[in-house]
Every structure is written in structure tokens, then in C-alpha cells.
């Protein structure tokens, strides 16, 4: 039997105006956005709907904004939202957990806000960067990264075959980019990000978030969630918490996650939230599946 997977995007999909149409047309959306303003202690809706790109790009704003857009969109689907499985890319994992009933809306938002602030502090304490690498097999990239001496640099996002992101110390990432270009990478491009996400440089954030996650009540999700760290289905709350904590310093194994969902019967992938990045990645990983978006 064919199954439907709902997937939730991470940082990078944000744009000014996101969520405005939902707010204006759905009473439930308006109620949840206003609740979010109260929980966060500032009017995030003002920045989302009519702020500047610079305001929206602040990590403490971007992460809650993306979470809110995706989760509220999913909740507004009502009975139409019938996932057989869910997954989220990086930050999107929190959206997926709330949509699947493993976390309450309020607790999910508090954790995402905590995650954003902890990551911001880790970026300031341990400056780093990330770079997109295109046109080399994943194994080749990993092999070359092992030869880079001095500093931290690891494969951080396995997005789709031939497209991954590396993360680490600025100098080590720059040297890795040169080595990867020499090895035949079509592109090795530094990204405009605030730090070395999904690398050991995020350890202070992992410690801070671990405490908050352990203190939060999680529930068994209504369907399996395919988490970034193990890249397979997880149902138990203990495992979900452990993987959420590990995710901050571990790679996002998106390619393997999508492959696992397809192996378990997914033939239709619906991206919930701004943009269509995940639909593009899913099509590159599994060309035979159907994709659509709910923005």
C-alpha cells in the first residue's frame, strides 16, 4: 500500500511575508500566532509579516519563525493531515514532532527558541562556517575531509547524492574547499551562515538544549518519525529525545532518511512550510515518488 510522508524544512527557507496569509485567513492560525507572540515575549509576527530580511535572518527569529509557519500550516490542514510518516530537516525535526503529536505546540516553540539562542551563543563562543559541496560522491568528500589537518571540519548535511554541506572552523573549511575543488568538485561554496551548525563546535548548544529537552514531556508520535541522526523510523520518546539532542553536533542524514521512508512504502512526499527545497531534494533522491507542497 502506498504511504504519504510529510516533511518539514529547516533554516534557509524563510522569507518576509511568511505566514501572513495563514494569519489573515484561518482563525486557528491567528490564535496560535498570537499565543506564540506571548510565549516568545516579542511580536515575532511583526517581523515575519513585515520585517526586514536582516531582522528575519537573526537565528533567534529565523528558527521560531520557520517552526511556526510549518506547524501552524500543518495544524490548519485539519483532517486532511493524515501522515503515515514524518521527517524534518534539522530544525524541521521539531516541526515534525509537533505535527505528529509527540510534542505540544507550546513546548515545541519553547524548545526551538531555546535551541536558537543556544546556537547563537555557541556561534559566538566557537566561530565557524559552512560550505556547500556539489558534484562529488559523499564517500569521496568524507574521505578527503579526514585528510584536512588542524581545526574541525566535517560533513554536516547529506542533502542528496552529489550535494552535501561541510561545517567547521573557518580556516579548516576553506582548506577543505580547496582540496575538494582539486578533487573534482563542481562547486565548493561558503554559505552565508552564522556558524558551524551540526559540528562539534555546537557542543555548548547541545549541552544547553539537552537540559531543556530532558525536562520537557514528550509523547508517542501518531506515526513514525524518521530522525536526522539515525536516518530511520523512531517511535519511542526516549529515542526521540536522545536523537534531538545529538542532532546539534551530528550530521543531518537526509539522503538516507528519504531512502528509508521510500523503502518503508512512501510514494508521496508533502512538504509543509515555506519554499520547495525539500521537494527538490526528495526528487533527486527518489525520482519515482510524487512531491507537493503546502505553504
Regions found by a protein language model. Name each.
Residues 2-141, 191, 268-294:
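FabD-like malonyl-/acyl-CoA
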Residues 251-266:
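A short, acidic, amphipathic alpha-helical segment used as a generic capping/interface helix at domain edges
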Residues 11-13, 40, 75, 100-250:
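Alpha/beta catalytic cores of group-transfer enzymes, especially the acyltransferase/condensing modules
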Residues 65-70, 246-254:
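A short, flexible low-complexity segment enriched in Lys/Arg and Gly/Pro that occurs
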Residues 78, 181, 262-265:
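Non-catalytic positions within long, well-ordered alpha-helices that form the structural scaffold/packing
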Residues 172-173, 212, 265, 288-294:
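NAD(P)-dependent dehydrogenase/reductase Rossmann-like domain
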Amino acid at each position: 500500500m502506498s504511504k504519504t510522508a510529510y516533511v518539514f524544512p529547516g533554516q534557509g527557507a524563510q522569507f518576509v511575508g511568511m505566514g501572513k496569509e495563514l494569519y489573515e485567513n484561518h482563525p486557528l492560525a491567528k490564535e496560535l500566532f498570537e499565543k506564540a507572540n506571548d510565549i516568545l515575549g516579542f511580536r515575532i509576527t511583526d517581523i515575519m509579516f513585515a520585517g526586514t530580511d536582516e531582522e528575519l535572518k537573526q537565528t533567534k527569529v529565523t528558527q521560531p519563525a520557520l517552526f511556526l509557519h510549518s506547524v501552524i500550516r500543518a495544524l490548519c490542514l485539519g483532517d486532511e493531515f493524515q501522515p503515515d510518516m514524518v521527517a524534518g530537516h534539522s530544525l524541521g525535526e521539531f516541526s515534525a514532532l509537533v505535527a505528529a503529536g509527540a510534542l505540544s505546540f507550546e513546548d515545541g516553540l519553547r524548545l526551538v527558541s531555546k535551541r536558537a539562542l543556544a546556537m547563537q551563543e555557541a556561534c559566538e563562543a566557537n566561530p565557524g562556517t559552512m560550505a556547500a559541496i556539489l558534484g562529488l560522491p559523499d564517500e569521496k568528500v568524507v574521505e578527503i575531509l579526514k585528510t584536512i589537518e588542524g581545526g574541525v571540519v566535517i560533513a554536516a548535511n547529506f542533502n542528496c547524492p552529489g550535494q552535501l554541506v561541510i561545517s567547521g572552523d573557518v580556516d579548516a573549511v576553506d582548506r577543505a574547499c580547496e582540496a575538494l575543488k582539486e578533487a573534482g568538485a563542481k562547486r565548493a561554496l561558503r554559505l552565508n551562515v552564522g556558524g558551524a551548525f551540526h559540528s562539534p563546535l555546537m557542543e555548548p548548544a547541545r549541552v544547553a538544549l539537552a537540559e531543556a529537552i530532558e525536562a520537557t514531556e514528550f509523547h508517542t508520535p501518531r506515526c513514525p518519525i524518521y530522525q536526522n541522526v539515525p536516518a530511520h523510523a523512531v517511535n519511542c520518546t526516549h529515542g526521540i529525545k536522545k536523537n534531538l539532542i545529538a542532532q546539534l553536533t551530528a550530521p543531518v542524514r537526509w539522503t538516507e532518511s528519504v531512502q528509508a521512508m521510500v523503502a518503508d512504502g512512501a510514494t508521496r512526499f508533502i512538504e509543509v512550510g515555506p519554499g520547495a527545497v525539500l521537494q527538490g531534494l526528495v526528487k533527486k533522491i527518489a525520482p519515482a515518488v510524487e512531491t507537493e507542497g503546502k505553504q
